[in-house]
Structure formats: C-alpha cells, structure tokens
Amino acid sequence: MRSEKEVYDIVLNFAKTDKRIRMVTLEGSRTNTNIPPDDFQDFDITFFVTDMDSFTSDDKWLDIFGERLILQKPEDMELFPAVEKGFSYLMLFTDDVKIDLTLLPLELIDEYFTWDKLVKLLLDKDNRIVKPPIPTDIDYHLQKPTQRMFDDCCNEFWNTTTYVVKGLCRKEILFAIDHMNDIVRKELLRMISWLIGIKQGFHFSLGKNYKFMKQYVPEELWERLMSTYNMDSYPHMWESFEQCMALFREVSSEVACQLDYQYPLYDEKISNYVIRQKKKYGIEDDNK
C-alpha cells in the first residue's frame, strides 16, 4: 500500500504539470484531526479545472494514479444519478488505496468553500484563496435539540412504529425491516445522540452514521441497542422492535427531563396499539 506522502506526491505532481488544473483541495476524514487515521480512509481530492470536457471525454488520464480494481463515475450513471455538482471518479486501486477524485469548474470555487468546513487547500496556482481555511468538523457536532426538534423526533418515531406493526402483522417482514432501519432506528440513534450531548457536551461529533457512539454510552445500553439488529425471523423482529420502543421511551424520557421538555402523551397510546395488534395477530417463526 502506498504511503500517504506517495499518494499526495502523485496527485500534486500531476496537478502541477497540467495547466488545466488550477487548484487542488482535500476533504473528508483525512482533514479531521479528531478521526484516528487508518488504511481505509479515502483520499477525497478535488481538482478545480478550466476545461471539464477535456477530462471527462476520456478516462485514460486516470491511469497515472495506479492500477484500479474498480472505478465508479456517479455523474455518468443512469440507475444511480448523482445529485452533487461536478464530475467524480471513485477509484479503488490494487494496493488498497482509495481515491475519490472530483472535478469542478473554476467558477464554483467560492460556492465550494460554503459546502463543508472539512477542507484543506493543497495547491493554489493562481493565489485565488487569500486566507486558506482551517479544517474543522464543527458542522458535524452534536446539536442541542429545541422542544420542536424533540417533538418531531418523537412523532416520527412513534408514527412509524405503526408501519412496522403493519408489516409484521401482514407477514411482510421486508417492509417491516425497511421501516425499522430507515426511520425507527434512525430516530432512536438521534435521540441517544442528544442524551450523549446533554451528558458530555455538544462540542464534538459522533462521526458518520454515529460510528463513535459506543465510546459514549453505558455498556448495558450498547448491548441492548445491538440486540435490536437481530431481525432474521418474526419472533426476533418483534423482540428487536419492542426493544427499540423501550430504549426510545427511556432515552427520550431522560432527554425531556434533562431539558425540561414535555414528553408526548401518544407514546402510551401507540404502545397500547402495538400490544393490541401483536396479541391479535400473534407471532410465529416464519420468514416467508
């Protein structure tokens, strides 16, 4: 595997010798001093260029970065069209180095620096940036919820539990799992993150997908949270679902108490609805 210096040398030497490339930046976790470095970190590189078409019309210039295992061009896909501006190349190389390279036109420079604060300037041929930004992850720090935000999280969680119940009672486990993972679990994790912020402060980030959450919660809570990922049968799905509801109730009640917010009354009503439906339809170990 090439070293970090070797990768930067290849990228910057190429950029310095190509007149179309006027500026180079680095984004993402490699700019964040709060993220422990490891071999899986991508090199998120952006080239600001004078002529986009001359690059995108032929991929041969990418060979300078090494032999690739796979290449993805999100902006060139029909099934998964990209929503971001520019044109990007997601490259995994045979030595396990991963480079996500994006091309942007020069006219987007000012707008670009408003998108994210985790940016480091690597090359500026024309001295366009008077004061290079200092990378910071402040935009990803935990956010103290307002009463309205707290209410919205509770409402989204408890409203969506009715969809999970519907899927389980209809024996549509994929429907139930989808709503459990995409919405119910998402709001549970959000609520847990708020409790962490209340106890630890709102001055740091839990990382993408809450990947550092384990460091900040009691072992008992963590084990209960992990148990909710067992969804391979209807009985297990019911157990995971009920554990999610119990965890959310406990955590959100504590958040409400700590922030002096009103806890929603519909928790009890929806919980009784879930009990009633489960009793009516029962459970069985059937994955069909």
UniProtKB/Swiss-Prot annotation:
State the name under which the record lists this protein: Aminoglycoside 6-adenylyltransferase
Q: Cite the entry's keywords alphabetically.
A: Antibiotic resistance, Nucleotidyltransferase, Plasmid, Transferase
- Name the Gene Ontology molecular function terms of this record: nucleotidyltransferase activity
The top of its lineage is: Bacteria, Pseudomonadati, Campylobacterota, Epsilonproteobacteria, Campylobacterales
Asked if Ribosomal protein is a keyword of the record, the answer is: no
Catalytic activity reads: streptomycin + ATP = 6-O-adenylylstreptomycin + diphosphate
**NCBIfam families found in the cross-reference section:** ANT_6
Q: Anything else the record notes?
A: In strain C179b a 10242 bp segment of DNA has been inserted into the chromosome between cj0168c and sodB. This piece of DNA forms a multidrug resistance genomic island and is transferable among C.jejuni strains.
Annotated EC: 2.7.7.-
EC main group: transferase
List membrane-spanning regions. Answer: none
Role played: Mediates bacterial resistance to streptomycin, is probably a streptomycin 6-adenylyltransferase.
Annotated disulfide bonds: none
Return the InterPro entries for the record: Aminoglycoside_adenylylTfrase (IPR007530), NT_sf (IPR043519)
Knockout-associated phenotype: Loss of streptomycin resistance.
Its BP terms in the Gene Ontology are:
response to antibiotic
Specify the species.
Campylobacter jejuni
